[in-house]
Amino acid sequence: MGDWFMQGSPPDFAVQEDRWLKAVESCHQLFCSCSSAWDHLRNILQTRGYWPQGPPPYRSEPHTEHSRPPPPKKRRPWCGGDGGGDAGAGPSGVAGTAAGGAGGDGAVGPVEEDDPTVADLIAAMEEDER
């Protein structure tokens, strides 16, 4: 997205908006079990102008057992500890989630090589559109 400076014209954000919203929804599903990570991602997108300010435009009622996506196969390192055990949230450096108990110092946990990144999700979506 940065090479538009060389071309002299900004990208058409109206065209890109749908792609970004799909990426954000994918991230929401990925981060669903860790609300602090989701809030952190939304704040980053709001700061950069990719997410509208104010209340989130997605369905805000809590997930039911039928609407909740299946849990991740392995615990993500950035989520809070279990029952006050592990360290708090990772990259955002915030305290652990309520379910995680006391949290910790917000130290970054180990990242597995096969953990998807936001860039991986966006690249996969762009590949699907082709």
From Swiss-Prot:
Stretches for region Disordered: 48-130
Record-linked InterPro entries: HEV_TT_vir_Orf2/Gyrovir_Vp2_N
Taxonomy, superkingdom: Viruses
One Pfam family linked to the record: TT_ORF2-like
Biased composition (Gly residues): 80-107
Protein name, entry field: Uncharacterized ORF2 protein
Organism: Torque teno douroucouli virus (isolate At-TTV3)
Phylogenetic placement of the source organism: Viruses, Viruses incertae sedis, Anelloviridae, Zetatorquevirus, Zetatorquevirus aotid1
